[in-house]
């Protein structure tokens, strides 16, 4: 017994002196920390939150402060504006309404908005609204449109620049009206449909359109491209197009639901899958219901090209996928978002069950956000089995 005890002591002493390799994830941690630190320094970003999921295992990284004034650190409860990532929630709401047979994406707006019958806007389909293929809207609803009556008049007087389904013009008005119509089909205002129905069903308890008073202390201060403090200003159709404020933890849960790593009710699962259907092709990119898809793995060059000025601000010819392409596993499903003072990026690959969220409280050029996101995606891919 004494001889065995002596052997064990010698063995564990030798083990303690040996150079045991660090956990594999520590190298990934260091790479993410290096990339985020360089990014924050280059663009003078006060705070960044990163979330990674690999086969259901979550990892969070918080850097910097949510406000230069208060010096409050970015943490698990920090709320960020996510800009156009909000559109993915609107797409999910519309898909959920379709699963519940409250609408069909093949329908025309006039079925739900009788005041649109007889106008060009009623000639497009709800699918056109959800895929940026209605015929050409400006990026934003004109600033002079403020009331519901003015919004109605705006869409009644709208005329397409090209036939529906032939070109993609990224814009807020179409997605915004898809959200309005989805809520109308559910017989409630959009805010109630989103915050009273969809978000609770998704289990997102820290995601808002209007941040409640009790949560304002966690609402990050955004900064514009000149470093001045700013938060989003509500405008026409702001709720369905850029209104969501959320945390890295809640947004990563949304990603995990999209990856089928977090179980939800069957109808909601079908709705989520419905947003992954491919309807149009633009170069390498497949346009789903708001979500954009690229072949996986996607190079930084591919990501940058898909987020270029040409793709975002110009009308580009698309090819309709007939029949629509069922949800694919080996693709990168992604969406960028920004407001005047915040930036966001979400991406996931169903085949390898990996996903990332990237949130920041400063306006940063798209290419900078994409470069950092690609590094994080590459690192997440290295974590996967």
Swiss-Prot record:
Protein residues bound to substrate: 335-337
Grouped into one coarse class, the protein's main location is periplasm
Any one GO CC term of this protein is: outer membrane-bounded periplasmic space
What domain of life?
A: Bacteria
Instruction: Please state what the protein is called.
Output: Beta-lactamase
- Cite any additional comment in the entry: The class C beta-lactamase family has a specific amino-acid numbering system known as SANC, for structural alignment-based numbering of class C beta-lactamases, or else the simpler name structural position. A multiple sequence alignment was used to derive a consensus sequence and then the consensus was numbered taking into account insertions and deletions. This allows use of identical numbers, e.g. for active site residues, despite differences in protein length.
Q: Name one GO biological process term.
A: antibiotic catabolic process
This chain's function reads: This protein is a serine beta-lactamase with a substrate specificity for cephalosporins.
InterPro entries named in the record: Bact_CellWall_Synth/Modif, Beta-lactam-related, Beta-lactam/transpept-like, Beta-lactam_class-C_AS
Q: Which UniProt keywords apply?
A: Antibiotic resistance, Hydrolase, Periplasm, Signal
Q: Which reaction does it catalyse?
A: a beta-lactam + H2O = a substituted beta-amino acid
Q: Which GO terms describe its molecular function?
A: beta-lactamase activity
Q: What class of enzyme is it?
A: hydrolase
- Positions of the catalytic residues: 84 (acyl-ester intermediate), 170 (proton acceptor)
Q: Does the keyword Transferase apply?
A: no
Specify the signal sequence span.
Answer: 1-20
Cellular compartment(s): Periplasm
Its family remark reads:
Belongs to the class-C beta-lactamase family.
Say yes or no: keyword Transcription regulation present. Answer: no
Organism, by scientific name, is Lysobacter lactamgenus
EC numbers for this chain: 3.5.2.6
